[in-house]
Amino acid sequence: MIVLQTIAVAFAMFSAIPVPQFDWNEKNMRYAMCAFPLIGAVCGALWCLCGALPLPALVRAGGFCLIPVWVTGGIHLDGYADTCDALSSYGGREKKLEILKDPHCGAFAVIRLCSYFLAYFALCTAVQFTPRIGLCWTLALVLERALSGLAIASFPLARNTGLAHTFASAADRKAVCSVLLVLAGLLSAALVLLGGGALILAALLVFWRYRVVSDRQFGGITGDLAGWFLQKAELWMLAALAACQWGGLL
């Protein structure tokens, strides 16, 4: 029962998929970040379904773009937009953190979101779907969430409130880190065997950048920064996927 509640907590927070409602407590939140990667598996499964349907290329690419937004409800895009606004302010640490809490969407966020979707759509049109491509991308979507959960459990926090603090403080950090490290290792091994090693490199480079930016610019991570990482990792891994296929590796 606790396992199902733990999964429900993760899906209730990080997806728009309807799940049974439970009261969040210490027990069912302790390992919620371990269940977070399952949302990536759902996104990947729907991505493969879209790829397998006999759709025109542009319609299929549009589906590839929209699936992660529909599944997650845009929660990570919200964090991406807020972080882009904060970074574009070139203000001090406290000003950036204040911008993250501002519910309004600034001009820089709109510009970055439009640029993001244009790049994402272009890359989706460049990818020719095959079962192998679909499997690689599903593994990548799970991997990025494993890394995101690992960061929540191990990176310093910018403040003692907010989404990241809620899940980090409730987590059994040692156990969560152990599970997600093993999962990330297994996913990476599978991607290497499939010829998608470049996707791992892309994810790790964005992960490193995430740590550097969060420490230097914000004094730690927040829920918005976690969304910023996830969206950037997804875009760069998609670029790596297209490059691997173009180079004949996939």
Model-derived segments and their meaning:
Residues 1-24:
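Membrane-proximal soluble regions of multi-pass membrane proteins
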Residues 9-12, 26-51, 165-169:
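N-terminal beta-alpha supersecondary unit
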Residues 18-24, 75, 95, 149-159, ...:
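C-terminal ends of transmembrane helices
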Residues 29-47, 86-132, 136-137, 174-188, ...:
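Multi-pass membrane catalytic core of lipid/isoprenoid biosynthesis enzymes
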Residues 34-84, 134-139, 195-216:
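Membrane-embedded alpha-helical segments that form the functional core of polytopic membrane enzymes
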Residues 67-105, 212-233:
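Acidic (Asp/Glu-rich) catalytic motifs at the cytosolic membrane interface
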Residues 146-180, 217-222:
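Solvent-exposed interhelical
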